[in-house]
A protein has these predicted regions:
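Mobile-element integrase/transposase regions
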Residues: 1-52
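Mobile genetic element proteins and their domesticated derivatives, centered on retroelements
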Residues: 41, 55, 61, 80, ...
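Active-site beta-loop-alpha junctions of metal-dependent nucleic acid enzymes
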Residues: 45-48, 65-86
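Coil-to-beta-strand transition motifs
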Residues: 48-50, 58-63
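Short, well-ordered secondary-structure micro-motifs
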Residues: 50, 102-105, 128
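Short, surface-exposed connector motifs at secondary-structure boundaries
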Residues: 60-64, 84-90, 139-140
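Acidic/histidine-rich, metal-coordinating catalytic segments
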Residues: 87-102, 120-121
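Charged alpha-helix within mobile-element recombinases
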Residues: 107-110, 114-115, 119-186
Length: 186
């Protein structure tokens, strides 16, 4: 079975340097009043194999996703830069996973975007992303090896999710909300 640690166990694999706490995140990000506040995470496939890097815009629920070969911080960094470099960008709220240790490099690369980290083991602080990852799991069940799944198929499923009406958006799709807003920004 899975090995577990006692409650006194201290993690020895290094600590992630936290740049900002979630409580310091701007109010506009907290109340979803603007585009460009992203929540990030990784969706693991089979253990040690390929995974998905996901970012969800808090206001529109618009999903950006990319497959990477392994859950490594340098690969997550490259995927993040590629996914978000053309998008409106105000804040990023990832989880506290070791895969986000390269966040200072991402900040430098993406116009000084600030990262806001939630408390450890508080996934509900990034509920938008966790919910969307749950929707992604309809297509990519837990433990499924993502290595042989083509990027085109993944993007097809991401597009399906972005074009699915959501009750919280007044039955508009994330795509409609995101692109009607970004067109106003131009």
């Amino acid at each position: 079975g899975k090995s577990r640690h006692t409650k006194d166990y201290i993690e020895k694999r290094g600590k992630i340097q936290i740049s900002n706490e979630l409580k310091d995140r701007p109010e506009e990000a907290n109340n979803r009043s603007r585009l460009g506040d992203w929540e990030g995470d990784t969706v693991a496939g089979a253990t040690g194999k390929a995974c998905l890097v996901t970012y969800v815009d808090r206001k529109s629920r618009f999903l950006k996703c990319m497959k990477i070969a392994k859950k490594k911080s340098d690969l997550v960094k490259e995927a993040t830069i590629q996914l978000l470099k053309e998008e409106p960008l105000c804040t990023i709220t990832p989880d506290r996973g070791k895969e986000f240790t390269a966040h200072p490099d991402i900040t430098e690369e993406l116009n000084q975007v600030q990262f806001y980290f939630p408390l450890p083991r508080h996934p509900w602080d990034r509920g938008t992303n966790e919910n969307t990852n749950g929707l992604l799991r309809e297509y990519f069940p837990k433990g499924k090896d993502l290595t042989d799944i083509p990027e085109e198929y993944i993007q097809e499923k991401v597009d399906e999710l972005n074009k699915r009406p959501r009750k919280c958006l007044g039955y508009k799709t994330p795509y409609e909300v995101y692109y009607s807003e970004t067109l106003h920004l131009i």
